């Protein structure tokens, strides 16, 4: 199947004994940075796992894997990128990837187009954010009208 042809895809996780749903959405290719404040989206929708559905904003997780090969080294890793999508916008925006270094600076860049989040991000308790990154999107949802 192509991501442009289906509304969702589910698979059964035998470890958790649960069905896991993924939805295709247009999403940014990378997290924003000081050099690229608004990353371009992928050319086609990618599959994201919904983790929060609010009135104004939804949150998603994108599972990723990386492989790096050199002459003397082979590294493999898995991680995830947290995304949010405002209801009236076309592209999901990445807001966090699990790194504790520079998280608040990144969030200030991500949420700059949303003035309602300025105070929340400035006063963010990063330790609490690391424990539950989706809590920030729940707050964002409650602040949007």
Residue ranges and their predicted role:
Residues 1-120:
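Aromatic-patch recognition
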Residues 114-145:
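C-terminal partner/receptor-binding element of secreted or periplasmic proteins
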């Amino acid at each position: 199947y192509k991501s442009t042809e289906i509304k969702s895809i589910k698979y059964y996780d035998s470890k958790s004994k649960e069905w896991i749903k993924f939805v295709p959405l247009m999403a940014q290719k990378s997290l924003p940075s000081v050099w690229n404040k608004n990353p371009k989206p992928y050319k086609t929708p990618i599959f994201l796992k919904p983790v929060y559905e609010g009135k104004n904003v939804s949150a998603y997780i994108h599972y990723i894997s990386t492989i790096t090969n050199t002459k003397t080294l082979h590294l493999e890793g898995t991680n995830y990128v947290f995304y949010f999508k405002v209801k009236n916008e076309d592209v999901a925006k990445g807001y966090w990837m699990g790194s504790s270094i520079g998280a608040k600076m990144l969030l200030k860049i991500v949420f700059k187009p949303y003035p309602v989040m300025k105070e929340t991000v400035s006063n963010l308790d990063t330790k609490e954010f690391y424990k539950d990154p989706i809590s920030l999107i729940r707050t964002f949802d409650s602040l949007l009208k």
